[in-house]
């Protein structure tokens, strides 16, 4: 089932996501919904907070890109980056920030401990686009968005677009959840 994606300024995107203790039917259903939503948008990565669930869980699939056609879709649960190497700037976008892009500097390769869709422990090295997408999605699990990593000059360039997103003035080609602001009296 395609589920709506939470948009910039929604509180769930700023929370530290909770670790999972296992994979049950509910998590399996969530994973299926996340893949379907990601493919429909279309996107190449999606973290649970982006669909309103504050859990340390993400899915990704970069096989739509010719040079990564042999990379299988991934489920990553409770990820922990344990080592990084090199740095590279690259343009990023995000389904929670429709229409917005910016250059982000990130490590070009990472070593990652995580659990797979069977909740089996894994440790692997990732580089290039796969490392970038993993880091981008892990940021979501830590309550961080790619715009938080922009250089000040770059951030100033996109501030009007961020303000428009926060106030609901944007166009998305996929279902979204608009943030609700609660007045605290």
From Swiss-Prot:
Keywords: Hydrolase, Iron, Metal-binding, Protein biosynthesis. Binds 1 Fe(2+) ion. It is an enzyme of class 3 (hydrolase). Its cofactor is Fe(2+). The active site is at 137. GO terms for biological process: co-translational protein modification; translation. Disulfide bonds: none annotated. It comes from the Bacteria. Its EC number is 3.5.1.88. Removes the formyl group from the N-terminal Met of newly synthesized proteins. Requires at least a dipeptide for an efficient rate of reaction. N-terminal L-methionine is a prerequisite for activity but the enzyme has broad specificity at other positions. Belongs to the polypeptide deformylase family. This is Peptide deformylase. It comes from Chlorobium limicola (strain DSM 245 / NBRC 103803 / 6330).
